[in-house]
């Protein structure tokens, strides 16, 4: 800071005579400059004129103003982040029911959910090492819920995730020109994690198999992780019926660590609860 000489102090005092102070400001007699009543910091400084003799006294911000500005910027960034996450969820979770697949809604009945939490906790390493998961097992054992919890948790951390399935992808590809198809498939690389739900439910036509290969191969080449859920047995994936399936399954098995879901059928249990609730409703009598 410039030393306040008698000459400079005279200039300061002259300028102070016409200055307008805010309610939280005062002029400090010790230096004649504007200060903050709250923190005591300077809100005015002395700067030499460039290229000619003399000085001028511009405004500056004090510590509490700086903190308030930083808090405002942080709040704006939080708001932008929330809006960004909301947009990413709308894009990444294309079925509304997936919004409920969260760790907060986990009943604790499936011990495998600890692996889902661990995957999220170690996401940076999983992403760096291109580690995906292959969730296989019978219908209703919690594979989609497991994958959905990972998707929601990472999306909440502002990680781009897409959870979809091949019937949806194939439906989108229908009617597209070749160039548009390539662009659509390449768009999956915008997501740090790609989740393909229910592999094997799609029709195994030549066209479908070709498009599935393009999607999996594109992901494979991008060296970004994917999570696959399927009702197929691991033996079926390791011993595919033909070359078309082999090209797809080999890439999945190379990049995705298998996890077996062999517990109870949660979907059947939920259906039982639904039937009981429906029974209570239709059999109830109003007073």
PLM features: what roles do these ranges have?
Residues 127-147:
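Walker A/P-loop nucleotide-binding motif
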Residues 198-199:
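Walker B catalytic acidic pair
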Residues 93-133:
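Pre-Walker A (pre-P-loop) alpha-helix and adjacent loop at the N terminus of AAA/AAA+ ATPase modules
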Residues 133, 162, 195, 227, ...:
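Hydrophobic/aromatic beta-strand patches that form the interior of the parallel beta-sheet core
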Residues 1-107, 269-287:
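A short, basic N-terminal segment
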Residues 111-120, 128, 151-191, 203-210:
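Short glycine-rich substrate-engagement loop in P-loop NTPases that contacts/grips substrate
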Residues 159-160, 190-193, 222-228:
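Loop/turn-to-beta-strand initiation segments
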């Amino acid at each position: 800071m410039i030393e306040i000489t008698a000459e400079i102090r005279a200039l300061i005092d002259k300028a102070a005579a016409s200055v307008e102070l805010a309610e939280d400001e005062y002029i400090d007699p010790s230096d004649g400059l504007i200060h903050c009543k709250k923190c005591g910091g300077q809100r005015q400084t002395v700067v030499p004129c460039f290229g000619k003799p003399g000085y001028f006294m511009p405004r500056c911000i004090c510590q509490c103003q700086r903190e308030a500005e930083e808090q405002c910027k942080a709040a704006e960034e939080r708001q932008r982040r929330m809006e960004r996450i909301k947009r990413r969820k709308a894009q990444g979770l294309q079925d509304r029911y997936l919004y409920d697949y969260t760790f907060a809604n986990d009943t604790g009945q499936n011990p495998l959910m600890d692996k889902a939490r661990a995957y999220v906790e170690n996401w940076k390493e999983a992403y760096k090492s291109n580690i995906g998961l292959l969730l296989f097992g019978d219908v209703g054992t919690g594979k989609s819920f497991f994958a959905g919890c990972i998707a929601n948790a990472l999306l909440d951390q502002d990680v781009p995730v897409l959870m979809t399935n091949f019937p949806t992808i194939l439906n989108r590809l229908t009617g597209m020109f070749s160039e548009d198809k390539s662009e659509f498939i390449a768009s999956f690389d915008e997501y740090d994690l790609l989740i393909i739900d229910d592999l094997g439910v799609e029709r195994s036509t030549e066209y479908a198999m070709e498009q599935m290969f393009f999607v999996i191969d594109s992901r494979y080449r991008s060296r970004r992780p994917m999570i696959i859920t399927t009702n197929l047995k691991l033996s079926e994936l390791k011993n595919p019926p033909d070359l078309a399936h082999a090209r797809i399954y080999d890439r999945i098995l190379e990049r995705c660590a298998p996890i077996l879901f062999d517990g109870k059928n949660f979907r059947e249990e939920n259906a039982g609860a639904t039937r009981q609730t429906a029974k209570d409703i239709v059999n109830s009598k109003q007073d």
